[in-house]
Swiss-Prot record:
Its EC number is 1.2.1.41. Disulfide bonds: none annotated. The keyword Metal-binding does not apply. The gene is proA. It is found in: Cytoplasm. The keyword Nucleus does not apply. This is Gamma-glutamyl phosphate reductase. It comes from Colwellia psychrerythraea (strain 34H / ATCC BAA-681). NCBIfam families: PRK00197.1, proA.
Amino acid sequence: MTDFNIATMAQKAKQASRVAAQLNSSEKNALLNDIATAIENNSDAIIQENSKDIAAGREKGLSQAMLDRLVLTDKGIKDMSSAIREIVALTDPVGDVDKLSLRPNGIQVGKMRIPLGVIAMIYEARPNVTAEAAALCIKSGNAVILRGGSEAIHSNLAIAHCLHQVLTTHNVDEHIVCVIPDTSRSVIEQLLQQSDTIDLVIPRGGEGLIRYVSENSRIPVIQHYKGVCHLYIDKYADLDKAVNILVNGKTQKPSACNAFETVLVHSDISAKFLPLAAKALNDAAQVKVHACKNSIGFFPNAELATNEDYQAEYLAQEIAVKVVSSFDTAIGHINEFTSDHTEVIISQDISRSQKFIRQINSSVVMVNASSRFSDGNQLGLGSEIGISTSKLHAYGPMGLEALTTEKFVVFGDGQIRQ
């Protein structure tokens, strides 16, 4: 598209962000309810546009996994609308004043939650992200610029049409939600230079996309390169729990970034646990295993693990296994290979579990639970807009509050500084 100008769009989004910030909770919820209804009412049109993306994807030779993420069905449309209505039910964080304290001179000092401003989302496939990201940004009082992958352009524009119809009906600036219609790579390059108008970039997709955005942006970026999630089976583990959690965390959805990629097993219980794990992983999904020299004998057809295997995010029915001689060795391995996403310990020993929580600083640390719970909705945040594995400005799954920041508010009665 030769007439598209990203700088102009970003400027309009910046102006619209001031409108978004002033909407009250009732106004935002009314918008979101009507958006959910509009998406349902236009499901046939959205699915028709989605079919164009599917056909083009097949012609381009997209993988079946990518096509699965791209496809929209009647159920998918209903799920999208339900996700928006769940956002309606969330508490609006904007305008809350807390941490109010009285200073010796009589002034009261507090902090108020405010929107970030303009958020740019860069993502691949998954047209539902268009609707859910827009809804989260509206609810948190932000404007958003959405740049989906070229493989979903027809679907994204159809969803954007529903969003803009509702915004116009409510007499709200439609540039609160901007969907970039240009699929060229050069637009991403230009988008990442708009530091005067865009406040935050959130990339969602493969490691290559996220690294490209992080390395080329003049705007702060929420980073989450990959999910190398570890499961540590302690010598005081309940082995039945351990097997169930391993199978769930690895095989339920291996393409998810919260799936297990490495399991560490304490040597004291390895002879008991590994045969159970081998059978369970094979029965569940014929999981391919990369095993250390001390565990390879328990897994028929396993390959000998290398350091590269312990760094790998397989995103498939594949896992690395290592026997460790001590609790501290497990901690050391995790800290060496972590991606700061999610780590899990299975142990009935409270003191060891607490030590694990203290010594592992990934964004989510769990005790006796599946890594599959490392998800905004499962953690009680509602829909998540992304995951951060860098400690600034958010850490872990990001919900509504992560799309806001704080400003100081001061209440006085004529005080002056002496």
